[in-house]
């Protein structure tokens, strides 16, 4: 595989599949020995997630708010989407799945169903509450009926808004705000990193993001360390 110009991650995944197959074959008596033990496994460099600067995130949110001033349903919806993605660190699929009964505006919290059907309650702040309330009261259409009637985010025809539409809205807002191009998942990364920078502990960030293990959340400490090193090298006279 190494001679076919495949990426390290692809080679690693395929090697893992081969090892898994032969482990099963040996366990069930289909082969006498496991030839995959001789397979090497390349080290895969872990890429750091894309994270907006705090000022960049603020610019993105302010741009979304300013566009929504005209009361356009599309702009109100986009404003609510980016505010919630950044405020809660929700996955785009979790945002799409939100129903009206999952929202508590008074408590400023969302009930989110994450991976493995794990449920969590995530708080959000006043800016996200303002955006969401504006969308629900002034932008969200009232469909005559159908499967999308309880969805928080609806399209013009009353259907549940999809992940692709949310991604397009986020990319559009990033371009208009003249910040780094980001996807919804980058807002999740940004939320986690900014929480840690602000003094939140790893366990809290794990709960907010809905990670099943703390080790998944620890990647954001690497992001913080990388940012720290970058800032140090820029600022210190003897870096």
Region spans (language model):
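Conserved catalytic core of the tyrosine transesterase superfamily
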Residues: 1-239
């Amino acid at each position: 595989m190494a001679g076919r110009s495949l990426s390290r991650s692809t080679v690693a995944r395929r090697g893992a599949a081969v090892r898994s197959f032969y482990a099963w074959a040996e366990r069930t008596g289909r082969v006498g020995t496991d030839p995959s033990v001789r397979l090497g496994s390349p080290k895969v460099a872990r890429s750091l997630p894309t994270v907006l600067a705090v000022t960049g995130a603020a610019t993105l949110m302010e741009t979304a708010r300013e566009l929504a001033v005209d009361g356009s349903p599309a702009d109100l919806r986009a404003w609510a989407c980016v505010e919630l993605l950044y405020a809660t660190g929700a996955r785009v699929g979790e945002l799409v799945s939100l129903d009206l009964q999952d929202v508590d505006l008074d408590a400023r919290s969302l009930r989110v169903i994450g991976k493995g059907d794990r449920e969590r309650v995530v708080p959000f702040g006043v800016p996200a509450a303002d955006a969401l309330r504006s969308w629900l009261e002034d932008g969200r259409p009232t469909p005559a009926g159908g499967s999308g009637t309880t969805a928080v985010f609806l399209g013009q025809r009353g259907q549940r808004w999809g992940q692709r539409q949310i991604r397009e809205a986020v990319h559009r807002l990033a371009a208009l705000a003249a910040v780094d191009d980001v996807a919804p998942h980058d807002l999740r990364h940004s939320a986690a990193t900014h929480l840690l920078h602000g003094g939140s502990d790893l366990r809290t960030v794990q709960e907010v993001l809905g990670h099943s293990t703390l080790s998944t959340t620890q990647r954001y400490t690497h992001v913080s360390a990388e940012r720290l090193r970058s800032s140090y090298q820029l600022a210190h006279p003897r870096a």
